[in-house]
């Protein structure tokens, strides 16, 4: 009987120890939310499961509380930088073909700007190009015109967009593109012709600047000048 009593006492102690371990395991369970309920897994497998579990990959451990809290991960800084770079690239697009001017080329956007540019040129030779952004011949000729402008820095080149200045262009009888006008000081318009860069170079080289005559008499030039400004002021 004494042996039975001792066995019973040992069984009770074993049950208490088992209960204590169960309580301790239950207490640890919140600290390991990613572990599966299988208690036969060794510690290495538990660690691998813990690191590869989706819920653990988005958790952050807080030492102060001893618990893992599920917080959203911050977006990497590299993505933010990439967005800013793309925005800067969009803001700095290369200029259109008609915007690539030589230093002595001026864009004209109105009749007032046109008259002001002619007046400010003084006795310098002024070459006016009438063009269209949609004109294939204008686009093909433009790089050569820019080169000519660089080779003659004393000449003023004015660029008139036909679509932006239709009333003025029509009053000047500009009916084909590209079209060129030559002006100089009080002499007014000296010459006008369409398209050919060879004509532009020939007109420049006919006589040394500033005595550019182009085969036009002084009386003809004065008449042309007065007629031109009368037509311009009718637009205003």
Curated annotation (Swiss-Prot):
The active site is at residues 135, 138. It comes from Arabidopsis thaliana (Mouse-ear cress). Signal peptide: none annotated. The lineage of its organism: Eukaryota, Viridiplantae, Streptophyta, Embryophyta, Tracheophyta. Thiol-disulfide oxidoreductase that may participate in various redox reactions. Possesses insulin disulfide bonds reducing activity. The keyword Chloroplast applies. GO terms for molecular function: oxidoreductase activity, acting on a sulfur group of donors, disulfide as acceptor. Belongs to the thioredoxin family. This is Thioredoxin-like 2-2, chloroplastic. It is found in: Plastid, Chloroplast. Disulfide bonds join 135-138. Residues 83-220 form the Thioredoxin domain. GO terms for cellular component: chloroplast. It comes from the Eukaryota. Residues 1-82 form a transit peptide.
């Amino acid at each position: 009987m004494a042996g039975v009593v001792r066995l019973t006492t040992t069984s009770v102690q074993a049950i208490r120890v088992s209960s204590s371990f169960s309580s301790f395991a239950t207490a640890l369970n919140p600290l390991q939310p990613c572990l599966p309920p299988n208690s036969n897994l060794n510690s290495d497998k538990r660690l691998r499961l813990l690191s590869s579990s989706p819920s653990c990959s988005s958790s952050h451990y807080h030492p102060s509380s001893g618990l893992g809290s599920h917080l959203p991960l911050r977006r990497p800084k590299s993505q933010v930088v990439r967005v800013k770079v793309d925005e800067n690239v969009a803001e700095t697009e290369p200029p259109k073909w008609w915007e690539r001017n030589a230093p002595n080329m001026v864009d004209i956007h109105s009749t007032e700007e046109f008259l002001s540019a002619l007046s400010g040129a003084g006795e310098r030779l002024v070459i006016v190009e009438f063009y269209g952004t949609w004109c294939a011949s204008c686009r093909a000729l433009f790089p050569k015109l820019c080169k000519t402008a660089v080779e003659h820095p004393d000449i003023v080149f004015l660029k008139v967009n036909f679509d932006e200045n239709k009333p003025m262009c029509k009053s000047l009888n500009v009916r084909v593109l590209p079209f060129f006008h030559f002006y100089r000081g009080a002499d007014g318009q000296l010459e006008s012709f369409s398209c050919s860069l060879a004509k532009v170079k020939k007109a420049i080289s006919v006589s040394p600047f500033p005595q550019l005559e182009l085969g036009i008499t002084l009386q003809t030039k004065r008449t042309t000048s007065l007629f031109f400004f009368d037509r311009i002021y009718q637009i205003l």
